[in-house]
Amino acid sequence: MIFSSSLLENAVNEFAKLPGIGKKTALRLVLHLIKQDNAEVTQFSDIIAKMRNEIKFCSRCHNISDAALCNICSNPMRKQEMLCVVENIRDVIAIESTQQFNGIYHVLGGIISPLDGIGPEQLTIDALVERVPKEEIEEIIFALSPTIQGDTTIYYISKKLSAHRAPAGPGGQDHPVKITTIARGIAFGGELEYADEMTLAKSISNRIPVENFIISGN
């Protein structure tokens, strides 16, 4: 692609760095911005800068948030005892779009993938294990992409939850934790965020029990 302006070329190259944006799409976006008046372009750039500088991650679930707690964790109408474990923030948005889940989330920040150099220590698995007894979670729903890496992550976390349990101490109370995974309505190897809302909704409604654990209460 040959450009008559280095300013145009630089802008196109920056847009093309975004996921899923090729040079041709980047060019269309930049040319669209050129046609807009200064106020609209300034507003666009200000919104991007404000988002980048002020956006936070929820201290509880690691979802995107405007405050210390996201609007899902801080919502008293959500089922606080039902925890959905997802790979990334895009999966939270996909599941919320189905309007079939009214619990809370835990964002792992990825899945275990040794070939990509991603191990348990790079994810928020330890924080998840700590949340389960502390928040008296009754059901954990794994909503990970149906891949070998996703299944490996489910297996690892399930074993870690089992190993983490401890006999109830004085005043402690054991409670059963139901572990489920979404049904395989999504093709193996596919990614959760690309599933249509109806398929994803059915996968959540028809989730499959994995195993029951007894996690010691505090």
Named regions from a protein language model:
Residues 2-9, 30-92:
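Cys/His-rich Zn2+-binding cysteine-cluster or related metal-binding knuckle/ribbon modules and their
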Residues 19, 38, 51, 63, ...:
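Conserved phosphate/pyrophosphate-binding and hydrolysis machinery centered on Walker-type P-loop NTPases
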Residues 26, 75-144:
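Extended interfacial segments that mediate partner engagement and assembly in macromolecular machines
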Residues 103, 174-177:
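A structural micro-motif
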Residues 149-162:
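Short Gly/Thr/Asp-enriched flexible loops that form oxyanion-binding sites at enzyme active sites
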Residues 165-173:
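Short Gly/Ser/Thr- and charged-rich N-terminal loops/segments
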Residues 176-184, 191-217:
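Conserved phosphate-handling catalytic cores of large alpha/beta enzymes
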